[in-house]
Amino acid sequence: MNRYEFLKGLHRVYRPRTYLEIGVNDGRSLALSRTRTIAVDPAFKVTAALHCDLELVKATSDDFFARPRPMRSLRRGVVDLAFIDGLHLFEYALRDVFHTERHTRWTSVMVLDDMLPRSVDEAARDRHTDAWTGDVYKVAAALAEYRPDLLCVAVDTTPTGQLLIFGADSRNRVLSHSYDEIYAKYVVPDPQQVPQDILTRRHAVDPVAFLAADFWHELTHARDRILRRGGGFEQLRPQIEAAVRSCARVPVPG
């Protein structure tokens, strides 16, 4: 399943009421939205037909998030589904994550693209290949270290994988407050030391099976009822973790 097929499946099973896209390019992913949408890109070149109520913003994501009330055109200013495919460098992707999280609820879903590079060359910070993920894959490790309260799921989509983030907390400031420390630890010169589990997608879930998991119904139900994070995510997290174990290409330890 490719990235666009998986995103289409997410729109189908999760039925977001609002959608944020960072990094529009030619609009192929944006064309999947059928809901109120904000799309951000400093140099978009949309060629796909669009089918959503859209605010298209020509700006960098940093400049967009620096605006007062950047999500004011969305229902209650809350992002249900976010697709982050901006500049392919770790620090930019990390900032996009914690800036987006401030406009979410725990039932929101964030999707990061290009999280499973296929080679060390493809993961280089200094691009020298045609296909390029950069070092954004390291965001998963940073979240595991600094935000274990989040549940991150690697998805084996073609060509370069994706990461889903569940359990967002709009009040959490750990990532922004620790940004300089995280940057110093994770931003290193090429060649990048890409873990073998990333290159082999050892613990990534099968996208078709994961979209068919039962927890999506419970997640959308909790979202629509506006259940609080405390009890809601604590109850739902084991269901998502069980889906990860059953859908992983290779069994996930623990």
Q: Which stretches of residues belong to each language-model region?
A:
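A short alpha-helical cap/connector motif
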Residues: M1-F83, L87-V111, M115-G254
